[in-house]
Amino acid sequence: MIIKPKIRGFICTTTHPVGCEANVLEQINLTKARGPIVNGPKRVLVVGSSSGYGLSSRIAAAFGSGAATIGVFFEKPGTESKPGTAGWYNSAAFDKFAKAEGLYSKSINGDAFSHEAKAKAIELIKADLGQIDMVVYSLASPVRKLPDSGELVRSSLKPIGQPYSSTAVDTNKDTIIEASVEPATEQEIADTVTVMGGQDWELWLNALDEAGVLAEGCKTVAYSYIGTELTWPIYWHGALGKAKMDLDRAAHALNDKLAAKGGSANVAVLKSVVTQASSAIPVMPLYIAMVFKKMRAEGLHEGCMEQILRMFSERLYKADGSAPEVDEDNRLRLDDWELRDDIQQHCRDLWPQITTENLPELTDYFEYKAEFIKLFGFGIEGIDYDADVNPEVNFDVIEL
């Protein structure tokens, strides 16, 4: 079929398998160009490995460190009449390129929150790898099915205490609007912590530990974002922030547990990037368009892949084997460049000046849109989007 982009709200409902493969290859080539990650991990489990930071982590481990990887994700394959999700095609491409280089690659497609996914991952590790030395936790999901009761819990992208109003961009109409979001109820806050907090990360590590598959010195990392006062009302001081604070709580508990075997658990605070997850957060697209332009001008721009490579080589797996620098909460900070005073002051000064008319000139808004559509495999140079492509892409994946 011939596949063109169809955008609805903040998601693109179509995906291009060839474009998604090109994205993955671009990240692999970037990783190889950086050279090997000295002292990197060799047997890695990535929970949430099909897009964004999770996919980049799997690529860094495999193509930067020669690691065997197991990826867990929840994606839809394509059928003859309908494309699959971008994450499906990303994972298929990763598997293809990893196997071509003789790297071990196995994937599990199912609900990562379930007991079943954990049991299947443990079974694979025991059968094929024995133990693992790194666990990356990179889930972004709006809903969690509680594994014991089967209850569906939903997260909310809302402020706490009072309504939040701010200048934002309508990404469908490319116009500047005033966005208003009502505050979360106590129940919505609690539910957001249940879905996006650290509980499932702990459940994964506890299950892996009890099964005896965590190697001596095993490291685990989960990803977070803090941002600045420009996004705090909707993010860090909102319902999502409470969940991310719970991730910090889990990190301390897990770090105590893993320290006994010479390992560690950290939250890594990453920079804002264009992902399916961030595009759903009110105000983030406008903030990203502003901060990206300034960071590009300063030579500090990083996408998902560059961020993760810096986390591996300059934090967790330093060439000299020294311990990573952490903040007062034991977090790895990769948002350090974004949070530079000059970068943030620029955004603060610019925010009130933005209009629909000057949006393209004062920000990297259209670059943001191009990067967003690229997540789904579109707008990539050298790809013929009028060509017939097969939406059915099969690979070595265990379906739960």
Curated annotation (Swiss-Prot):
InterPro entries recorded: Eno_Rdtase_FAD-bd_dom, Enoyl-CoA_Rdtase_cat_dom, FabV-like_NADH_b, Trans-2-enoyl-CoA_reductase
Q: Which Pfam families match?
A: Eno-Rase_FAD_bd, Eno-Rase_NADH_b, Enoyl_reductase
- Which EC number(s) does UniProt give? 1.3.1.9
Q: Which domain of life is it from?
A: Bacteria
Transmembrane ranges, per UniProt, are none
Task: Tell me the Gene Ontology biological-process terms attached to this UniProt entry.
Answer: fatty acid biosynthetic process
Positions with a binding annotation for substrate? 225
- Which residues are tagged with the site Plays an important role in discriminating NADH against NADPH? 75
Q: Is-annotated flag, keyword Lipid metabolism?
A: yes
Q: What class of enzyme is it?
A: oxidoreductase
Residues bound to NAD(+) are 48-53, 74-75, 111-112, 139-140, 244, 273-275
A GO molecular function for this record?
enoyl-[acyl-carrier-protein] reductase (NADH) activity
> Which pathway does the record list?
Lipid metabolism; fatty acid biosynthesis
UniProt KW keywords? Fatty acid biosynthesis, Fatty acid metabolism, Lipid biosynthesis, Lipid metabolism, NAD, Oxidoreductase
Could you tell me what reaction this enzyme catalyses?
A: a 2,3-saturated acyl-[ACP] + NAD(+) = a (2E)-enoyl-[ACP] + NADH + H(+)
Record carries keyword NAD? yes
Q: Which residues form the active site?
A: 235
Quaternary structure and partners: Monomer.
Q: Which family, according to the similarity comment? A: Belongs to the TER reductase family.
User: Sorted alphabetically, which PANTHER family does this protein's record hold?
Assistant: ENOYL-[ACYL-CARRIER-PROTEIN] REDUCTASE [NADH]
General function of this protein: Involved in the final reduction of the elongation cycle of fatty acid synthesis (FAS II). Catalyzes the reduction of a carbon-carbon double bond in an enoyl moiety that is covalently linked to an acyl carrier protein (ACP).
Q: Which protein are we looking at?
A: Enoyl-[acyl-carrier-protein] reductase [NADH]
